[in-house]
């Protein structure tokens, strides 16, 4: 699958690389990064030139070497630069980490769907319990989202949500102001999971529940909690690491961008 030049450029710019104007006259993208002095990444602006695929491969190999990230993982991330991508990594050491029981794998996919639907319903109509996760926009988001290839590193399920898949606005207030609906959903999912996990880890779950009951626009719903339960298998005794890759097409605040994956165990 050929990576379009604009996708590669936008990915690099989102990760601190800046465009040098002198290459444009030769129809080349030339980028540099203050974190990697004396290194440049160069590739053609036109994907039809004969050496375009090789140039992209070289850029990815250089980037892999500089960042210590696997080339294939980088390639996957570049291909989803226009998506917000949810990653669920299952950690089940006693199972060998290379396969899952079929029933649990199915529950995991359903759980990922339910997480996104619960977050979408909260963005549209924040409440403690959604009687049915069947709001039209929530279902449309699931239709537009894509199930990615599992990745190396135990079992990693990826779901990519195109940032501009739906042209609607929710009612949940955001300090950032106007954001694409998909970004509102993925931010809500990240922030609600952060709240929930922090409360569990600090023994403050009862206090969180009371606060949610008083909140006119609660981030966490009972539906989200039910979805979380589907990510755990009693027989496997697994943990799940939840992380998000943010599309480069919309700004993301540093507190939301940074940090380790959220661990459910």
What do these predicted regions represent?
Residues 27-84:
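Long, continuous compositionally biased terminal/linker segments
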Residues 2, 49, 53, 102-106:
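Generic detection of long, well-ordered alpha-helical segments
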Residues 11, 49-51, 250-252:
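Residues in flexible loops and secondary-structure boundaries
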Residues 72-264:
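Long, hydrophobic alpha/beta structural blocks
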Residues 1-39, 45-46:
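N-terminal ordered "arm"
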Residues 24, 68, 151-153:
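Glycine-centered small-residue hotspots that permit tight backbone geometry or close packing
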């Amino acid at each position: 699958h050929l990576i379009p030049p604009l996708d590669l450029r936008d990915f690099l710019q989102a990760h601190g690389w800046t465009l040098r104007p002198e290459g444009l006259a030769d129809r080349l993208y030339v980028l540099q990064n203050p974190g990697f002095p004396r290194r440049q990444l160069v590739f053609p602006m036109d994907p039809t030139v004969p050496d375009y695929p090789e140039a992209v491969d070289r850029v990815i190999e250089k980037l892999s070497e500089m960042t210590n990230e696997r080339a294939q993982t980088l390639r996957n991330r570049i291909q989803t630069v226009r998506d917000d991508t949810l990653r669920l990594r299952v950690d089940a050491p006693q199972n060998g980490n290379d396969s899952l029981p079929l029933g649990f794998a199915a529950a995991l996919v359903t759980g990922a769907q339910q997480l996104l639907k619960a977050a979408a319903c909260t963005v549209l109509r924040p409440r403690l319990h959604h009687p049915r996760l069947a709001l039209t926009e929530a279902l449309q988001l699931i239709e537009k989202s894509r199930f990615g290839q599992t990745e190396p590193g135990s079992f990693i399920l990826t779901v990519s949500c195109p940032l501009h898949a739906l042209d609607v606005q929710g009612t949940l207030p955001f300090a950032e102001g106007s954001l694409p609906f998909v970004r509102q959903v993925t931010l809500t999912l990240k922030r609600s999971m952060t709240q929930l996990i922090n409360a569990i880890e600090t023994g403050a779950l009862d206090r969180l529940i009371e606060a949610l009951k008083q909140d006119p626009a609660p981030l966490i719903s009972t539906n989200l909690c039910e979805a979380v339960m589907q990510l755990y298998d009693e027989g496997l005794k697994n943990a799940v690491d939840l992380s998000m890759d943010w599309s480069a097409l919309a700004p993301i605040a540093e507190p939301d961008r940074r940090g380790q994956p959220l661990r459910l165990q």
